[in-house]
Amino acid sequence: MSDRNTAQQRSLFATAFVILISTSVAAVAWKLPFGTWHRASETPILSPQGNGWESAGTFNPAVVVREGKIVMLYRAQDTQGTSRLGYAESTDGIHFTRRPEPVLSPEGDYEKDGGVEDPRLVQFGDTYYLTYTGYNTKDAQLCLATSHDLIHWDRKGVILPAYKGNWNTGWTKSGAIVPEKIDGRYWMYFLGTTPDKNDQMGLAYSADLVHWTEATKTPVLPRRPGQFDSRVVEPGPTPILTSEGLVLIYNGADDKLVYRTAVAIFDRKDPTKLLYRSEQPIFAPQQEWEKVGQVPNVVFVEGMVDRGNDYLFYYGGADKYVGAVEAPKAR
């Protein structure tokens, strides 16, 4: 094969954003809904400020579009290590105006001292469903709250208790709810901790979005020893629905706890069935503020907005800042 033909094939590969996966039967092509990720800003779009509730860190945001604006709920941390959720909104997705006070602060015993962490958002009808981690400095547990305006929240409590799972015998965190029913049920990918102290991804289902049951006896997306996701496999934002399946952005950490971003595709009719998984990360720490902060070498994607021609992803940098990444839609 000539060098010219090889270059042409590589160009077509890059343009179509097609990933080839070798199987025992044949090569199956999976098409991702987006192209190459590019930082929308080389600097943080949200940073810690003041001496109070958001003075140590503002990071790991969830986002939705409401009344023509991008609304962000972000994790804010004070110098004592207590987390709350702040509210900010934007017309362009980059420049945000914050509310002066948090919209969700620790109240229950399961949130005391540690706080409310790492939000994810999904909307059904006129109700917003917020999954978050309740942390009381001893236990981290996956919790739920609902709202009609993203400001006033009704807590539903712990939805997946720690230490009581099928395979996840430790903490539970990071609930990414699929934005449509499948087989008459709601589905949610989550993080659980196995007896060997590794964090892996599980799946749960619900009839009402409040009461959840684990769907499997083993992780649906396990860690991979020796790779970039050898230690942590954690859901990102709400999955993207495509003809290929459920496209799930996830955050993986290696044995040195360097966090990078990757992609998995699950069957749209059977969300337990993994179809594709990144061999390499699609996004990694590069900027100084992604490498130096409260936790070094972290990019952690939790928010996503579909802007029509592209996607805008939001992430935490080094557990201190918020950044944004643009990715064109695949054609």
Where would I find each of the regions flagged by the language model?
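Bacterial N-terminal signal peptides
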Residues: 14-24
